[in-house]
Swiss-Prot record:
GO terms for molecular function: acryloyl-CoA reductase (NADH) activity; acryloyl-CoA reductase (NADPH) activity; alcohol dehydrogenase (NAD+) activity; zinc ion binding. Belongs to the zinc-containing alcohol dehydrogenase family. This is Acryloyl-coenzyme A reductase. Monomer. The lineage of its organism: Archaea, Thermoproteota, Thermoprotei, Sulfolobales, Sulfolobaceae. Zn(2+) 2 binds at residues 90, 93, 96, 104. It comes from Metallosphaera sedula (strain ATCC 51363 / DSM 5348 / JCM 9185 / NBRC 15509 / TH2). Plays a role in autotrophic carbon fixation via the 3-hydroxypropionate/4-hydroxybutyrate cycle. Catalyzes the acryloyl-CoA dependent NADPH oxidation and formation of propionyl-CoA.
């Protein structure tokens, strides 16, 4: 089968033939129906993920159909449509038993220690699998592992209450445009921030209010902002912090430039009673919650474009294109 393989540390990737996967005990083989490109891929290719073991198949977001199940697999059968979490938990530890699989000490990451999903077929551990409801499209389901499920968990950890106001930075990006929808589906009023007048009208389809510009805190403070979902990182963090009303929470998802740092003013966070929540992974519970909202039509996938596996270069060009809105998907 064909796959996108990262050859080594900072050595780029290539599309090449690899052996078809075979399931070991506790594993399944899926046919990849959709995968998704992510800014994290670019950071991995730049060498910012030290746990990567090479060569490795790239890609960590997938929806697929089970073709074959290995020994000991229960609850899943050939023909089931599934997504995978971003990682494989052991399923037995203290955290896994509490439903906090993201904290599992033994977790292994797809496209890091384990082969990812930019391939025609993929091997997935059963502890990672979540069934997709019939009414959820492939496009909506593939958004769950690294986008809608992740945002769902972030807002749950922020104890979002119905009627609160959520501000989303990078609101036209692949994460941001869906974060607006997740927050609204969870009962919030939503404010989207974008730096592009061109994209403001699109963001406005999903947000109650749109702010255009990199300096947005003063405009944001015209109402009480209770939660910020920061999908960008250091370039927007200061404005995000200043946007919050007392008792506010920042859910920090983005980190577009890992080489940059931010000097946090502790007194500011103390006096305003602000909580900063770092966040990167959904659990099974969160994935199921996001899938339910997707199946109900409360979250609609926004797709910037779709490319074939062998057009991966074109896909990354689209991902970097500042004029695109939404996620770039991959088919095989």
């Amino acid at each position: 089968m064909k796959a996108v393989v990262v050859k080594g540390h900072k050595q780029g990737y290539e599309v090449r033939e690899v052996q078809d996967p075979k399931p070991a005990s506790g594993e399944v083989i899926i046919k990849v129906r959709r995968a998704a490109l992510c800014y994290r891929d670019l950071l991995q290719l730049q060498g910012f993920y030290p746990r990567m073991k090479y060569p490795v198949v790239l890609g960590h977001e997938v929806v697929g159909e089970i073709l074959e199940v290995g020994e000991g697999v229960t609850g899943f059968s050939p023909g089931d449509r599934v997504i995978s979490l971003l990682y494989a938990p052991d399923g037995t530890c203290h955290y896994c038993r509490q439903g906090e699989e993201a904290y599992c000490h033994s977790r292994l990451g797809y496209s890091e220690e384990l082969d990812g999903f930019f391939s025609e077929m993929a091997k997935v551990k059963v502890t990672s699998l979540v069934k997709v409801p019939t009414r959820a499209s492939d496009e909506g389901a593939v958004m769950v592992p690294c986008v809608t499920g992740m945002v769902y968990r972030g807002l749950r950890r922020a104890n979002l209450r119905e009627g609160e106001t959520v501000l989303v930075t990078g609101a036209s990006g692949g994460v941001g445009i869906h974060a607006l929808q997740v927050a609204k589906a969870m009962g919030a009023r939503v404010v989207g921030v974008t730096t592009s007048e061109e994209k403001a009208s699109i963001v406005g389809k999903y947000a109650d209010r749109v702010i255009v510009g990199s300096k947005f805190s003063e405009e944001a403070k015209k109402e009480d902002i209770n939660v910020v979902i920061d999908t960008v990182g250091t370039p927007t963090f200061d404005e995000s912090l200043k946007s919050l009303w007392m008792g506010g929470r920042i859910v920090q998802i983005g980190n577009v430039d890992p080489t940059q740092s931010y000097q946090l003013r502790l007194g500011y966070t103390i006096l305003k009673d602000i909580a900063i929540i770092g966040h990167a992974s959904a659990t099974r519970r969160d994935a199921e919650g996001a899938l339910k909202l997707t199946a109900e039509g409360k979250i609609r996938p926004v797709v910037a474009g779709t490319v074939h596996l062998e057009e991966i270069d074109k896909g990354y060009e689209m991902l970097k294109d500042k004029h695109k809105v939404g996620k770039v998907l991959l088919t095989t």
